[in-house]
A protein has these predicted regions:
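N-terminal Rossmann-like FAD-binding beta1-loop-alpha1 element of flavoenzymes
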Residues: 3-32
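Glycine-rich FAD pyrophosphate-binding loop
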Residues: 24-49
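Mid-domain catalytic core of redox enzymes
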Residues: 26, 248-365, 369-375, 380, ...
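Short beta-strand to alpha-helix junction loop
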Residues: 63-70, 159-165, 171, 176, ...
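Mobile amphipathic helical/loop "lid" adjacent to a hydrophobic cofactor/ligand pocket
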Residues: 73, 77-78, 82-199
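FAD-binding beta-loop-beta segment adjacent to the flavin cofactor pocket
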Residues: 351-358, 410-436, 440-445
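Active-site-proximal substrate-binding core of FAD-dependent oxidoreductases
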Residues: 463-506
C-alpha cells in the first residue's frame, strides 16, 4: 500500500470532505482518514431502521440547510450533487408553564415579517397566539430583551476576535420575563444544543447575527430530501473519482510535523498501527478529536490552547399508525418540557412521505439536549418521560405508538465559543504545514456548523494550494445586513470605537 500522499486530512466530516474535494480538483492526491464507519461526521448516515418491514434511512439528526450556507450549497451545486431541497414552511413554538400549554407559529412570521431587520421580531407581537403565551413580567422586562438584541447587532465576536470571557447567555436571560426567556432558551437549545448557562455570550451573539437578527430571510432554510448521508456519500465518490483516497475506521493517534519535509500521521486501524506521510496535514476532526491529536502530538506547546466543548444529545423517533391534527413540520419545545425540538419526518423525507401515503402513519423526531442528569437516564426512563410530555401536546396519538427508537449521539457537537486571544487555533497553526478546518476553528467568517466547516475546509485547502503554487478557490460572500440593521450596527460600532479612544486618551 502506498503510504505517501500530497496531503493527509484527519477527519472525514464536512470540513475534511470539503478540503479533500478542493485539493483533488487541483490534481493533488489527498488521503482522508476517518475514524468512523462512514464519512460525513455529524452529517453522516447511520444504519437503517426497520419498522414493520419498512426500511427508514437513519442519521445523526435532521439538519437544516440555511439560506446563509452559501459555500456549502455552492460546492454541492458546482459538482451537481445538491438534491432538490425541501423548503421549510413553519416552525412552531410550543410553550408549557405548569399545566398550561400554548402554541404559536414563529418561523414564517420572522422570515416574512413586513418590518425590516432588526425590527422583524415585532411582527410576533401582532399574533394573538403569541401574545397569549406572555404574562405581565414579559412586558415589564421587554427592554432587557431589546438590549440583548442590540448587543448582538453592535458586537461581532468572530470578526473582532472578541471572546467576552466569563460571560454566558444564561446571565443575560435572567433579566428577561419568563415566556420570552423560555422562547430564547428553546432557540438556544435548538441551535446550540445546550443550556443557556453553558453558552458563552460571544457564541450566542454570533449565532443571532448569522441566523436571524441581521436579515429576515436569514431564518429561511431547507431540508435535504434523503438526509445528510446521501450528500456525504456523493461527496466521497466525487473525491475518489478525482484521485483522492478515503480510509474508514482509521483513527489518527498523533502526528509528527517536520520543518521542510514530510509529516507523519500515526493511525490505528483494526487493532493495527501504521504510518502515512505527506508534506501537508489538515486536521479536520471534531473539536474533542482535534484536542486529542494536538495534545498527544505536541504536549508541551499545547498546554494553554483552547478547544470548544463537544456536546452529546439524544434523538428519539416515534412512529404512530395515525396522523395527528394539523401541525407544522418542525418547531421547538420550551418551558416545562423534557424535549427541545421536533421534526415530523413524514412531512420532510421522501421515504417517510411514501410510508405515510401508503399507511396513513406519522413519525416525529425529537431531540433532548440535556441537562446532564436527564441525558444520564436509562433509555427506558428517558423514553417514558418524553412520551409523557409528548402526549400532553398530542393526546390524540396516545395508544397509537407503533415503535420508538432512541439514539445517543456522542459528545462531538461543537459549542460555539472563542478562546482567549492566542489560545484558539485558527486555520494556520504554530506548526509548519499543519492546518485546521472545522466548525470549531477560529476564523473571521460569521458562519456556523455545516457552513463554517465547509468554509474553513476550503480555506485550509487554499493554504496547501498556495504552498504548491496552484490556483486557490474563492469563498462565496454572505448576504449583507438589511439597511436598517447595517445602520444600527455601524452607529454602535462607531460609538464603541469613540469610547475606546476617549479611555485611551485619559
Amino acid at each position: 500500500m502506498d503510504n505517501h500522499y500530497d496531503a493527509i486530512i484527519i477527519g472525514g466530516g464536512v470540513a475534511g470532505l470539503t478540503a479533500g474535494l478542493h485539493l483533488a480538483e487541483r490534481g493533488l492526491r489527498p488521503l482522508i482518514l476517518e475514524a468512523g464507519e462512514r464519512v460525513g461526521g455529524r452529517l453522516a448516515g447511520k444504519e437503517d431502521i426497520l419498522i414493520n418491514d419498512w426500511c427508514f434511512p437513519n442519521e445523526h439528526g435532521v439538519h437544516g440547510i440555511w439560506s446563509s450556507y452559501v459555500n456549502f450549497k455552492h460546492m454541492l451545486r458546482r459538482h451537481e450533487i445538491l438534491p432538490t431541497l425541501i423548503p421549510a414552511q413553519e416552525e412552531q413554538w410550543i410553550y408549557r408553564s405548569g399545566k398550561r400549554i400554548g402554541r404559536a407559529p414563529i418561523g414564517s412570521v420572522i422570515r416574512h415579517s413586513r418590518l425590516p431587520a432588526p425590527l422583524h421580531y415585532i411582527q410576533l407581537f401582532l399574533l394573538p397566539q403569541f401574545l397569549w403565551l406572555l404574562d405581565l413580567r414579559d412586558w415589564v422586562r421587554i427592554f432587557s430583551v431589546w438590549s440583548t438584541l442590540l448587543m448582538a447587532i453592535g458586537i461581532d465576536p468572530f470578526v473582532e476576535d472578541q471572546p467576552l470571557e466569563g460571560l454566558t447567555f444564561g446571565e443575560e436571560l435572567k433579566r428577561w420575563g419568563p415566556a420570552l426567556r423560555a422562547l430564547f432558551f428553546g432557540l438556544t437549545r435548538n441551535g446550540l444544543s445546550t443550556d443557556p448557562e453553558q453558552v458563552p455570550l460571544a457564541g450566542f451573539l454570533a449565532f443571532l447575527r448569522f441566523y436571524t437578527i441581521m436579515r429576515r430571510d436569514a431564518w429561511a432554510f431547507d431540508y435535504l430530501p434523503n438526509g445528510g448521508g446521501e450528500v456525504c456519500e456523493n461527496l466521497a465518490v466525487k473525491i475518489m473519482q478525482l484521485g483522492g483516497e478515503i480510509r474508514l475506521k482509521s483513527r489518527v493517534i498523533r502526528v509528527d510535523a517536520t520543518r521542510g519535509g514530510d509529516s507523519t500521521a500515526h493511525i490505528q486501524h483494526d487493532g493495527l498501527t501504521e504510518s502515512v506521510n505527506a508534506p501537508f496535514i489538515i486536521l479536520a476532526s471534531d473539536s474533542p478529536g482535534a484536542e486529542s491529536v494536538i495534545k498527544t502530538s505536541f504536549p508541551l506547546e499545547s498546554t494553554s490552547l483552547f478547544f470548544p466543548h463537544g456536546l452529546a444529545h439524544a434523538v428519539i423517533r416515534l412512529w404512530f399508525d395515525i396522523t395527528p391534527r394539523k401541525n407544522p413540520e418542525a418547531g421547538i419545545f420550551s418551558g416545562d418540557f423534557i424535549m427541545h425540538n421536533f421534526f415530523w419526518l413524514d412531512k420532510i423525507y421522501d421515504s417517510y412521505r411514501k410510508w405515510h401515503d401508503e399507511t396513513g402513519g406519522s413519525c416525529i423526531e425529537v431531540h433532548v439536549y440535556g441537562p446532564q442528569d436527564v441525558l444520564a437516564q436509562s433509555d427506558a426512563m428517558l423514553l417514558t418521560n418524553v412520551l409523557r410530555d409528548f402526549y400532553r401536546v398530542h393526546p390524540e396519538l396516545k395508544g397509537h405508538l407503533i415503535k420508538p427508537h432512541i439514539q445517543r449521539n456522542a459528545a462531538t457537537h461543537t459549542l460555539p465559543a472563542l478562546g482567549a486571544r492566542g489560545t484558539h487555533l485558527g486555520i494556520e497553526t504554530p506548526w509548519e504545514n499543519l492546518f485546521c478546518a472545522g466548525d470549531w476553528v477560529r476564523h473571521t467568517t460569521p458562519a456556523f456548523f455545516l457552513e463554517r466547516a465547509c468554509a474553513t475546509g476550503i480555506e485550509a485547502a487554499n493554504c496547501v494550494l498556495r504552498s504548491r503554487g496552484l490556483d486557490e478557490f474563492e469563498l462565496q460572500t454572505y448576504p449583507p445586513p438589511e439597511p436598517l440593521a447595517a445602520w444600527i450596527e455601524a452607529s454602535m460600532m462607531r460609538g464603541r470605537k469613540n469610547r475606546r479612544g476617549k479611555r485611551l486618551a485619559k
